[in-house]
Amino acid sequence: MSATQAAPARDRLRIAIQKSGRLAEPARNLLSACGLSWRESRDKLFCYGESLPVDLLLVRDDDIPGLIADGVCDLGIVGRNELDEQAAARRQIGLPDAYQALRGLGFGQCRLMLAVPEEWQWQGPAQLAGARIATSYPAILKQWLAEQGVDAQVVELSGSVEIAPRLGTADLICDLVSSGATLRANQLTPVHNLLDSEAVLAGAVRVPDDARASLRAMLLRRLDGVVQRQDRKLLMFRASEDRVDALAQLLADAEPLVRLPADGGALRLQTMCPGPLSWQRMEELERAGAQGLMVLSVERSLA
């Protein structure tokens, strides 16, 4: 099926996720938080949606963009690094865009970086002219080198990229970095960031016009309700009318205060705060006139 063809009509949405790997468990947990549940096949490669007509296909992460492009799956949870690599490879051979990142999901963060041997003194991209760069992301690297106007040799490897300089097969590397421990163990220093990556929800450029369209819209709304509320807290308290402005100033990073029906002489107020609320901040609010402070975790919401 070409990238411009519409996928065959189906009444069930199909999502591809990693069968195993660092994104597999967080992806399933996220979809479960959206109210999805499944019955697994015996080979554990297909999960039939029970709560909603939304099925899971469990595959290798590098298969996910292609499954979306071919219309086999409607959505996929994959690292932005893999999605961008395959998109860049398609563009470099003249194929149109077939998928796009719809939402960042807030987990699986890493960076695609150039890393050089510790004895190098990094002076900038021009230093790479004629150099051999080992990578598992040749399309992204070639695109970046072209943007910099640098002619370098890209050495494509499928794994163990970090040992290439020690083996003499490359002068430096372009690889994913999380903690940097692997680079340090191989006497490499990260010097330039090509891409900030995280898990994303990817979907076809062309939205289906059958029953899947409403399922897709509903799932996106639920995902927003889960992802956007992660690490946010609902703060509830009472205060007198003359303390509201001062308290609002102390909560400038939060959503506007919402007034609830009055409880006796005090107002009941609530707001959504980003990140954790420390004891020090709660005590500061108390000194400013807040009473009965209560902090609640928010599991999900609908805007």
Swiss-Prot record:
Its main location: cytoplasm. The keyword Cytoplasm applies. Keywords: Amino-acid biosynthesis, ATP-binding, Cytoplasm, Glycosyltransferase, Histidine biosynthesis, Magnesium, Metal-binding, Nucleotide-binding, Transferase. Pathway: Amino-acid biosynthesis; L-histidine biosynthesis; L-histidine from 5-phospho-alpha-D-ribose 1-diphosphate: step 1/9. Feedback inhibited by histidine. GO terms for biological process: L-histidine biosynthetic process. GO terms for cellular component: cytoplasm. Pfam families: HisG, HisG_C. It is found in: Cytoplasm. Its EC number is 2.4.2.17. HAMAP family: HisG_Long. Belongs to the ATP phosphoribosyltransferase family. Long subfamily. This is ATP phosphoribosyltransferase. The lineage of its organism: Bacteria, Pseudomonadati, Pseudomonadota, Gammaproteobacteria, Lysobacterales.
